[in-house]
Structures are given as structure tokens and as C-alpha cells.
Amino acid sequence: MSSKRLRLIKSCILSLTLLVGISNALGDPPSKKVTLLLDWYPEAENAGYFYALTHGLYARAGLEVRISPIGPNASVEPQVALGKYDFGLGSSDQVLIARSRGVPLVMVMGSLQHDPVGVMVHDGSPVHTFADLEGRTVAAQPGLPWILYVAKKYQLRNIRIIPLSFDYAPFLRDPNYIQQCFITSEPPIMEHIGVKVRTLWVKDSGCDAYMALESSDRFVAAHPDVVRAFVAASIAGWRGYLADPASTDSEILRRNPAMSAIQLELSRKVLLEYHLVEGPGIAPGSLDPERMRNQYKILRTLDIIHADYDYRIAFTTRFISQP
């Protein structure tokens, strides 16, 4: 039997196993059209949802799911809060901030266990720690909580933030260039093309956000069975993607021509190496209330959240059923 045929058989068995697991967990699933708004274009960081879609996990759960991308200058949270989309991807800090401003969003699952955001420098850069960013210019998205946190923790009084171009060219041209990155994206690509880099992962500074699967209060209250079915299928999708990414990668490449197969492969390796989806004692989709409390305290200390509120309304664990 050829190795290609053997891989195909293994893929079919894995899909059937996941389908049976969801069926047993959910019983008779609801029939519902569901929309999901990504926080970027299709990529490895949202591949679990595409696995669930392409392998029929959503369909088996009674859900007809449409997944839409979003560009760099648009926001997920308002569109989900207003009901334009049933679910969206974002970050737990943004959900906490939105709730503090009266936006009725709720986090229903940890899409990734850690936000992969970081700072990338050339290997020859004198920047080795966050404290070394003092007096330097960093290309980043202005106003993000992690920037304010790092600046306060490391007493960065003279750090200059310039807009991130979402383009590799400035970094490749300038050996002193410093930019925001995703550890799953830019650093492995740079290494692949022969550019040596180092990365400071924001998580290691103590600012440890989740990547969030979020919905609106209204949708969760009106369709709890749909939320439960979508979360269960999405968790199964993440397990499936980590085990067998091939067909899902093909769908991502079809939807995002700017993506490459090698980039997907490199990003998936980082997802596994850094336990971004699951890790020792941590299952896909998990949410830790204590981590959410700590994150709320950070945002409150930074005065990004201006007044106290019950942070527990910003998330729920009731839809996360682990085997």
C-alpha cells in the first residue's frame, strides 16, 4: 500500500472518529445557519474552523457555517455585537475592554490558548529583552494593551510607535528595524528565507491574553444549543487539524492565494511547539477564569478599563465540554 493511500485512509478514520464523537456528545443537533468572522485572512491560526467545515463536523452538528475574512483596518467586535455575524475571532483583552464600555460581547471559547503577538528583531540587534526597547522605534498597531503593559512594566519612557505596514520589506531593508509580529507567522518565514531573527513573545512579559471565540449576549441567550454545537465542533476541528492538516491547508490556500503551503507548515509547527492550541493539562478551547481575572486586573491597572465591573460577564465556560 502506498504511503499516500495510507495517509488518506488515516485521514478518513480521523474524520469519522471526530464525527462520531460530536454526534454522541450532542445527540440531535440543531439546524441553523451560522456565520463566523475571522480576525484576519484564512491561515494556520484559524485553521481549526476550516477543518471543522471541510470535514463535515459542523454539518454533522446541524450547522451550516459560513466563514468570512477581515482586513487589517476593520474590527470584529462591533460587527459581532451588532449581530452582523454570530461569532467572531479576537482576543480576550479586547472582549474585556468592550464589556467595560457596554458592548454586549461574551467569550465562549479559547480559540488559541495564548496570543502569539510578539516583537521581532534581527539576530544582530542589541535588543534582547523588552527593557532594551527604551529609546527605540517599534512598528506596531498603536494603542494595543500589550504595548501599554510592556511600556509600564519595563519603564519605557522613550519608546516610539509607528504604524505597522503589514509588509516584510521594511524589516528586510533595515537591520535595525523592530516590529510587532505573530510568532506563528513572520519569524518562521524570515528564518525560512535565510534571515536570522529573534523574537520577544509578549506572553513572557506577563501579559497573557487568549485568542477568543466571541459572540453576542443576544445570540448566546437565544441560541445556546447552537453555541454549544459550534464550540464542540470547533474544538474537534482543532484536534483534527493538528493531527492531519493536508486537506484543510488546501482549502485555506484556495481561499487565501497570498498564503503559501510552506507558511502553513511552518505556522502549524509553531502552534504545536508553543502549545498555542493545547498543551500539558490544557485541552483545546479551554478558558481559565483565574487568567481572565488577572488580565482584567492588568487592564484596570493600565486604566484601559476605567471603572470596575464584574469581569465574569465577559466570558463563559459552560459551552466548553472536554472529554
Report residues per predicted region.
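Conserved C-terminal helix/tail region of periplasmic/extracytoplasmic solute-binding proteins
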Residues: 292-323
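Structured segments of extracytoplasmic/periplasmic soluble domains
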Residues: 52-55, 61, 79, 83, ...
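Short, glycine-/small- and polar/acidic-enriched structural segments
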Residues: 28-181
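Pocket-lining segment of extracytoplasmic ligand-binding domains
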Residues: 93, 164-260
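Secondary-structure end/capping motifs
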Residues: 222-304
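Bacterial Sec-dependent signal peptides at the C-terminal "C-region" and cleavage site
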Residues: 20-30
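Bacterial N-terminal signal peptides
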Residues: 11-21
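Bacterial N-terminal signal peptides that target proteins for export
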Residues: 2-13
